[in-house]
C-alpha cells in the first residue's frame, strides 16, 4: 500500500466536502487592523478580546523578562525550568481567579490544551465517570478519552438531563466538565446549576473559562466570579492566550488538588516549561485586566457586542443568541459559508468560516470574534460588507 497515496485520497475527500483548512500568514502584530498575506485587513478572527496582544506594557514586560531569564526555560517545571517569574505568576493567578475556594492555588501550563488534559486525566481514571457537555471543546473531549474513565455525554446545557445521569451513576469518582462560554456558539453554561449538581452528587466540576477569563465578572475575574459561585468541588481552567493577550493557561483549585496535579498530571510533568518571559508578560496583563483601563476595555467590548447583535439580526441568516465576544452567524452549507467568507475577504474583512467537524454538519457559520481594539467604524464596514456575502451565498 502506498502510504502517501492514502493520505492524498483523504485530502481529496476533504477538498470535495469543502473542508480544507488553510493557514493565513500575519505580517504584523495581532490587532483589529493588521497585515495578513501582504494585505491590510480588519480582523474578526482572533481571540484577543481585550486588545492586549500588542499592548506596550505586555511587550516591555516580555522583553525585560527575556533580558533577565533568557529565551527559554531550559527544562520542565520539576527539573530546573520553574523560574521566579512562573512562581510569582501562579500566586497572582490564585489571588485573581481563586475567589471560589478557601485555599486557592494555581498551576501554570504552556497551553490550554495541556491544562485541560491535566485536569481530566489526573482527577479521573479507570472506574470514574465523566459527564461532558455535548458541545465541549476538543481539548476537553480528548482529555475525557485519555483519562480512561467512563464518559457520558449530556445534551448541551441541559442540567436536568445531567442530574438524571448523575442520579443513575454509582461510580466512586464523578467529574462534570463544561466550557463556561462555548467557543463556537458564544452561549454560557448554566454554571449555578452545575455547581449545585456537583455538590449534591459529590462530583468534581471542571470548568474551562477560556473565553470568559479577563472579560466576564468584576475586574475580568471570570465566569465563576460573574455568578458569585464558590465551591470546594470546583476546578477552574483559564486561558492566557485570548483576553490576556499572551500565551499559556492555568488551573486554580484547592491547594490539595493542585499538589495532586503537580505529582500526577503528565501534561504538566513531562514537558518543558514555557519561557519565563511569557510569565512576565502575563503578570503585566493581569495588572491591566484588573485596572480602570481593563474596565474601560470591557465596557467598550460590551457596547461592540450589542451593536454586532443588532447587525446580525438584520441579516437573513441565523445569528446565535450570544452576549459574548463570540458572535456566530449560521449559514448552513459549507459552500455558502465559504462564499460568504470570500466575499468579505474581498472587501478587506477577515471573518473565518467554521465548518464540520468543528460544528455539526449543516451548521457551518461565520464566526465573528470581537475585540476591544475594534471601533464602531469597523462594525460599520462589516455591516455594509455583509450585503455582498448575502448575495454570493444566496
UniProtKB/Swiss-Prot annotation:
UniProt keyword Ribonucleoprotein present: no
Binding-site positions, pyridoxal 5'-phosphate: 112-113, 183, 211, 239
Catalytic activity of the protein: 6-carboxyhexanoyl-[ACP] + L-alanine + H(+) = (8S)-8-amino-7-oxononanoate + holo-[ACP] + CO2
Superkingdom to which the source organism belongs: Bacteria
Disulfide links within the chain: none
Protein name, as recorded: 8-amino-7-oxononanoate synthase
Alphabetized UniProt keyword annotations: Biotin biosynthesis, Pyridoxal phosphate, Transferase
Amino acid at each position: 500500500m502506498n502510504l502517501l497515496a492514502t493520505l492524498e485520497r483523504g485530502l481529496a475527500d476533504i477538498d470535495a466536502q469543502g473542508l480544507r483548512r488553510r493557514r493565513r500568514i500575519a505580517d504584523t502584530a495581532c490587532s483589529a487592523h493588521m497585515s495578513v498575506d501582504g494585505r491590510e485587513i480588519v480582523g474578526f478572527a482572533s481571540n484577543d478580546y481585550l486588545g492586549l496582544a500588542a499592548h506596550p506594557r505586555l511587550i516591555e514586560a516580555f522583553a525585560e523578562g527575556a533580558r533577565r531569564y533568557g529565551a527559554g526555560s531550559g527544562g520542565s517545571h520539576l527539573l530546573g525550568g520553574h523560574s521566579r517569574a512562573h512562581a510569582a505568576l501562579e500566586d497572582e493567578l490564585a489571588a485573581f481567579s481563586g475567589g471560589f475556594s478557601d485555599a486557592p492555588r494555581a498551576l501554570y501550563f504552556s497551553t490550554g490544551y495541556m491544562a485541560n488534559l491535566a485536569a481530566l486525566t489526573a482527577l479521573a481514571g479507570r472506574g470514574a465517570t465523566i459527564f461532558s457537555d455535548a458541545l465541549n471543546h476538543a481539548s476537553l473531549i480528548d482529555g475525557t478519552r485519555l483519562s480512561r474513565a467512563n464518559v457520558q455525554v449530556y445534551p448541551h446545557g441541559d442540567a436536568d438531563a445531567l442530574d438524571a445521569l448523575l442520579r443513575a451513576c454509582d461510580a466512586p469518582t464523578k467529574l462534570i466538565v463544561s466550557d463556561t462560554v462555548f467557543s463556537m456558539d458564544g452561549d454560557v453554561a448554566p454554571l449555578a446549576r452545575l455547581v449545585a449538581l456537583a455538590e449534591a452528587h459529590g462530583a468534581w466540576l471542571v470548568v474551562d473559562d477560556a473565553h470568559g477569563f479577563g472579560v466576564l465578572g468584576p475586574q475580568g475575574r471570570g465566569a465563576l466570579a460573574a455568578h458569585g459561585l464558590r465551591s470546594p468541588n470546583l476546578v477552574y481552567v483559564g486561558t492566557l492566550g485570548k483576553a490576556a493577550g499572551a500565551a499559556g493557561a492555568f488551573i486554580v483549585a484547592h491547594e490539595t488538588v493542585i499538589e495532586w496535579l503537580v505529582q500526577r498530571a503528565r501534561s504538566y510533568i513531562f514537558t518543558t516549561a514555557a519561557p519565563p518571559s511569557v510569565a512576565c508578560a502575563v503578570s503585566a496583563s493581569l495588572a491591566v485586566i484588573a485596572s480602570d483601563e481593563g474596565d474601560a476595555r470591557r465596557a467598550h467590548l460590551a457596547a461592540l457586542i450589542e451593536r454586532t447583535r443588532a447587525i446580525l439580526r438584520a441579516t437573513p441568516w441565523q445569528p446565535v443568541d450570544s452576549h459574548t465576544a463570540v458572535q456566530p452567524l449560521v449559514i448552513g452549507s459549507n459552500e455558502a459559508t465559504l462564499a460568504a467568507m470570500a466575499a468579505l475577504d474581498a472587501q478587506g474583512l477577515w471573518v473565518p468560516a467554521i465548518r464540520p467537524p468543528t460544528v455539526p454538519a449543516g451548521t457551518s457559520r461565520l464566526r465573528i470574534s470581537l475585540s476591544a481594539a475594534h471601533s464602531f467604524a469597523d462594525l460599520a464596514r462589516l455591516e455594509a460588507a455583509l450585503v455582498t456575502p448575502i448575495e454570493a451565498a444566496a
